[in-house]
Swiss-Prot record:
SUPFAM superfamilies linked to this entry: Lumazine synthase
Name of the featured protein: 6,7-dimethyl-8-ribityllumazine synthase
Protein origin, superkingdom: Bacteria
Primary enzyme class: transferase
Length: 157
């Protein structure tokens, strides 16, 4: 079985140098205790990777389905090197979970491809609150690292 950290870079790797980058974060407020922790962990990691605080913008939207339209608005500004989608969808008793998870994920991917901008997707999709709590900090940090690495990669291509 593969370790969850397989494929991660050392913090000293130049691909994780965020000093010249501008990053936008879109946070869904639904399940806010989880999404607050995700966003805080993401921002803390961006700062640790050298992204200046003044170059990190955070906008909030009601829920995961609204994340793609806010990402689109940020992408259209052409001011960001990468974006991060933050949200939390916890399975309930209805089909709504699948709808929200699938549509928000597809929307995030569409914006990334249409605007050729890296978007780290930290919209958690979990079976229960305990799974979300267990992942909230690590996935926020992971999203920051993905955003910085992909922004640097695209600038080098």
């Amino acid at each position: 079985m593969l370790d969850a950290n397989q494929g991660t870079l050392a913090a000293s790797d130049s691909r994780l140098n965020g000093k010249k980058l501008r990053i936008g974060i879109v946070q869904a407020r639904f399940n806010e205790p989880i999404t607050n922790t995700l966003a805080q962990a993401c921002k803390a990691e961006l700062l640790a990777l050298g992204v200046a605080e003044k170059h990190i913008d955070l906008v909030q939207v009601p829920g995961a389905l609204e994340v793609p339209v806010a990402l689109l608005a940020l992408a259209e500004k052409l001011e960001y090197d990468a974006l991060v989608a933050v949200g939390c969808i916890i399975r309930g008793e209805t089909y709504h979970f699948e709808l929200v998870a699938n549509e928000s994920g597809a929307g995030v991917s569409r914006v990334a491809l249409d605007y050729q901008i890296p978007i780290a997707n930290a919209i958690l999709t979990t079976e229960n609150l305990a799974q979300a709590i267990a992942r909230q900090t690590e996935k926020g940090r992971d999203a920051a690292r993905v955003a910085v690495e992909m922004a640097n990669l695209l600038s080098d291509i």
